[in-house]
């Protein structure tokens, strides 16, 4: 008798065949990768096909692969990764889709398929700059309205570009260039022979 994972893998291969750029298994979960042009069709079928039945999207996040594999990675930079759940079949799936353009990453929105992704797509837009075409309300959700840039991108400086503070003279919050000075952080070394006051 086939395991749940083997059954799901067979069902995915039967449903999508050549549309899957990659189908891999790690830590007891399957991951499929599809092209951006096939994304909506694959997502719709994942939800509607009774042999798959992924009626819930429990998470969607953006990923920046700029420094992946210590710079050895040479593929597209931005991706959206969805974690899907089938309650009726009791299985999970990870769906990954890469944005074809690294300069202006654009992917179709799947809000019409799984309405739970509404705020997830807004978060990926806010933090990574991934534009989800067809999203009903694509605007920033975590950063300030005047924020410039996307803070989870690998090329965004850790200290940011501006800081805000309350100015008592102007009686309002003001923006100013970052005043944090660069510094070298030296890790504290804990010697095993003196750890916690114990002698070995």
Swiss-Prot record:
Keywords: Cell inner membrane, Cell membrane, Membrane, NAD, Quinone, Translocase, Transport, Ubiquinone. InterPro entries: NADH_DH_suC, NADH_quin_OxRdtase_su_C/D-like, NADH_UbQ_OxRdtase_30kDa_su, NADH_UbQ_OxRdtase_CS. It catalyses: a quinone + NADH + 5 H(+)(in) = a quinol + NAD(+) + 4 H(+)(out). Its main location: membrane. Gene3D superfamilies: NADH:ubiquinone oxidoreductase, 30kDa subunit. It is found in: Cell inner membrane. NDH-1 is composed of 14 different subunits. Subunits NuoB, C, D, E, F, and G constitute the peripheral sector of the complex. NCBIfam families: NuoC_fam (TIGR01961), PRK06074.1-1 (NF004730). This is NADH-quinone oxidoreductase subunit C. It comes from Paraburkholderia phytofirmans (strain DSM 17436 / LMG 22146 / PsJN) (Burkholderia phytofirmans). The gene is nuoC.
């Amino acid at each position: 008798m086939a395991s749940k994972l083997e059954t799901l893998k067979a069902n995915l291969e039967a449903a999508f065949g050549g549309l899957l750029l990659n189908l891999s298994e790690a830590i007891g979960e399957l991951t499929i990768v599809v092209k951006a042009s096939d994304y909506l069709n694959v997502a719709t079928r994942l939800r509607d096909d009774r042999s798959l039945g992924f009626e819930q999207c429990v998470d969607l996040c953006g990923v920046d692969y700029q420094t992946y594999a210590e710079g050895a990675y040479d593929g597209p930079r931005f991706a959206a990764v969805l974690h899907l759940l089938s309650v009726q079949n009791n299985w999970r799936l990870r769906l990954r889709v890469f944005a074809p353009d690294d300069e202006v990453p654009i992917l179709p929105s799947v809000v019409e398929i799984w309405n739970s992704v509404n705020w997830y797509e807004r978060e990926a837009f806010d933090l990574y700059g991934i534009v989800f075409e067809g999203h009903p309300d694509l605007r920033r959700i975590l950063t300030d309205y005047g924020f410039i840039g996307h803070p989870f991108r690998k090329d965004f400086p850790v200290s940011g570009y501006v800081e805000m503070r309350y100015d008592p003279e102007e009686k309002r919050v003001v923006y100013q260039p970052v005043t944090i000075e660069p510094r070298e952080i030296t890790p504290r070394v804990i010697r095993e022979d003196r750890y916690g006051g114990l002698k070995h």
